[in-house]
């Protein structure tokens, strides 16, 4: 068995090449990947999109209501969201991963300053949550499943009357 050095709170701990070691390394890798992915969500950088998304990745978007493929397709989704909420910010709240699957919970905030899903801007600030499940292959997203709190967003921008 191979011995690895793992540092925890400044102490070096020897770990054997075990399932525990592989699990720890996958968690560290998943966290680093998602930090970079949040950067993509907030910047809509084409360079990051190519780095993090496989060319044949598939995305079914509740934002646009259709399927998108690859880095350019994902950028279309982000552009549709930014068109309605130019100051949109994604914040990673929780992350769980196992092997090539990563689940992430986000808070999303922004101001409705542009048209979104056919709804004229009203200038209202919104804060919603999203749960996304990412399937990774060779360090890139190949599939995303998402649950975007669209109903709450529509309430907050005034499409539906406030809940009492």
Region locations from a protein language model:
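Cationic, low-complexity basic patches in intrinsically disordered or flexible, solvent-exposed regions
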Residues: 3-6, 23
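C-terminal and inter-domain tail/linker signature
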Residues: 10-12, 16-164
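Short, low-complexity intrinsically disordered segments enriched in A/P/G/S/L with frequent Arg
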Residues: 1-3, 13-14
